[in-house]
Amino acid sequence: MARVKRGVTAHAKHKKVYKITKGFSGRRKNTIRAAKAAADKAGQYAFRDRKRKKRTFRALWIQRLNAAVRPFGMTYSVFINGLSKSGITVDRKVLSDLAINEPAAFQAIAEKAKAALAA
């Protein structure tokens, strides 16, 4: 059986790890042991934060909506209640975008929600 030298495979594996840790600082980018650990941890953070990003953005939309409906004399929860009573099914992302980019359209929606609460 022929002798297999491991240099080519090892170099390829190391190169793969270094590609992931490019941009990291200190030993974490150029020492294989530290780079492997850093790459693993980066993967864990990436996985966790892909889930967390969804929560964070929903919270941001809610904060924006709360701020946007205050001038109409409502809080966020009252506004959402009014929307459900008036049968308006627009999600928070779109409502938040409307509040920022189309204030007139958002005002019309807010007034409909307020009218549904009064009725």
Swiss-Prot record:
Pfam families: Ribosomal_L20. One of its GO terms (molecular function) is structural constituent of ribosome. It comes from the Bacteria. Transmembrane segments: none annotated. GO terms for cellular component: ribonucleoprotein complex; ribosome. Belongs to the bacterial ribosomal protein bL20 family. Binds directly to 23S ribosomal RNA and is necessary for the in vitro assembly process of the 50S ribosomal subunit. It is not involved in the protein synthesizing functions of that subunit. This is Large ribosomal subunit protein bL20.
